[in-house]
């Protein structure tokens, strides 16, 4: 056997000859012969698209409304923040602020560890402005603090107990802009009752005086001088009593005393009745009558 025959046998064993006269070995045609990964080999001629390796990225967890509304999100803050963020008088302002900030940093890291605290707050702020669920959750918290319940949250409370304020009876004892029966004191109700009784008595006296005005006779012009003098003197005495009573009432009001009682109201109504009767009768003394009264006073 010649050398050429031996070379032909080797070429047949090792591989096939290419068009340019070079030899390609069998392990180059089949990389798996030597245990190589097919994706690690490079071919000069056209590559099969199915053999292209792509780097797959892990899915990135985003901060969503569902994550913020989960048990580790905002409900956790609403439950534990009042206990963990208490301000102590025995600590300095720096220590209280540090404790306050540390609570929210730990909460943010447990909820979304991929972001820094500053970035987390920015994400929460932007998400809270755009997401409808977070806005509704925030409005429900505000309504709960104000004691306002809407929709299915309203219990079976009679309409009479709700009054006109729309506030539940449990929240009516709190400070409110609306005045209820419980907020008015007993003194105010008593003063209002006295004022009502005084107005009622005076109105009844006016009705009596109006009825008496229609019963006057035409013989009033023929009264004696003694009657005129008596009526004029009585008118002056009545005016003095009215002025004295008015002064006393003003002094009592300025000193913070209560309104007049029932007896004082009766006396005041009698004085008002006499004064109105005298004025309605037009029993005003003339110049001659006043002169006669002065003469009587001199005796």
From Swiss-Prot:
Keyword Phosphoprotein attributed: no
Coiled coil (residue ranges): none
GO terms of molecular function: DNA binding
Main localization, broad class: nucleus
Protein's cellular compartments: Nucleus
Region (Disordered): 34-54, 205-246
Compositionally biased tracts (Polar residues): 39-54
Protein's UniProt keywords contain DNA repair: yes
InterPro entries: Csm3 (IPR012923), TIPIN/Csm3/Swi3 (IPR040038)
Gene Ontology, cellular component aspect: replication fork protection complex
Keywords attached to this entry: Cell cycle, DNA damage, DNA repair, DNA replication inhibitor, Meiosis, Nucleus
Superkingdom, taxonomy of origin: Eukaryota
One GO term of the biological process aspect: DNA replication checkpoint signaling
Compositionally biased residues, Acidic residues: 215-228
Task of the protein: Forms a fork protection complex (FPC) with TOF1 and which is required for chromosome segregation during meiosis and DNA damage repair. FPC coordinates leading and lagging strand synthesis and moves with the replication fork. FPC stabilizes replication forks in a configuration that is recognized by replication checkpoint sensors.
PANTHER family, sorted: TIMELESS INTERACTING-RELATED (PTHR13220), TIMELESS-INTERACTING PROTEIN (PTHR13220:SF11)
Summary of subunit composition and partner proteins: Component of the fork protection complex (FPC) consisting of TOF1 and CSM3.
Family (UniProt): Belongs to the CSM3 family.
Protein name: Chromosome segregation in meiosis protein 3
Taxonomic source organism: Kluyveromyces lactis (strain ATCC 8585 / CBS 2359 / DSM 70799 / NBRC 1267 / NRRL Y-1140 / WM37) (Yeast)
């Amino acid at each position: 056997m010649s050398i050429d025959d031996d070379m032909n046998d080797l070429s047949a064993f090792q591989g096939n000859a290419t068009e340019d006269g070079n030899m390609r070995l069998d392990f180059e045609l089949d990389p798996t012969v030597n245990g190589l990964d097919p994706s690690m080999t490079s071919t000069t001629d056209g590559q099969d698209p199915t053999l292209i390796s792509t780097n797959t990225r892990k899915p990135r967890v985003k901060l969503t409304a569902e994550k913020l509304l989960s048990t580790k999100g905002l409900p956790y803050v609403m439950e534990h923040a009042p206990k963990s963020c208490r301000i102590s008088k025995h600590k300095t302002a720096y220590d209280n602020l540090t404790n306050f900030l540390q609570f929210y940093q730990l909460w943010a890291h447990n909820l979304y560890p991929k972001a820094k605290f500053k970035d987390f707050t920015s994400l929460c702020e932007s998400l809270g402005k755009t997401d409808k669920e977070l806005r509704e959750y925030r409005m429900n918290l505000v309504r709960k603090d104000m004691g306002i319940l809407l929709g299915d949250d309203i219990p079976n409370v009679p309409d009479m107990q709700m009054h006109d304020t729309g506030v539940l009876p449990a929240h009516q004892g709190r400070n409110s802009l609306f005045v209820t029966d419980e907020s008015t004191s007993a003194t105010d109700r008593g003063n209002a009752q006295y004022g009502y009784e005084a107005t009622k008595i005076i109105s009844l006296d006016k009705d009596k005086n109006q009825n008496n005005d229609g019963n006057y006779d035409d013989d009033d012009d023929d009264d004696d001088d003694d009657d005129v003098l008596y009526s004029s003197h009585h008118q002056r005495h009545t005016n003095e009593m009215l002025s004295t009573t008015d002064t006393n009432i003003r002094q009592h009001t300025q000193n913070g005393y209560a309104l007049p009682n029932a007896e004082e109201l009766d006396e005041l109504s009698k004085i008002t009745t006499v004064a109105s009767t005298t004025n309605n009768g037009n029993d005003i003394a003339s110049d001659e009558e006043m002169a006669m009264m002065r003469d009587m006073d001199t005796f």
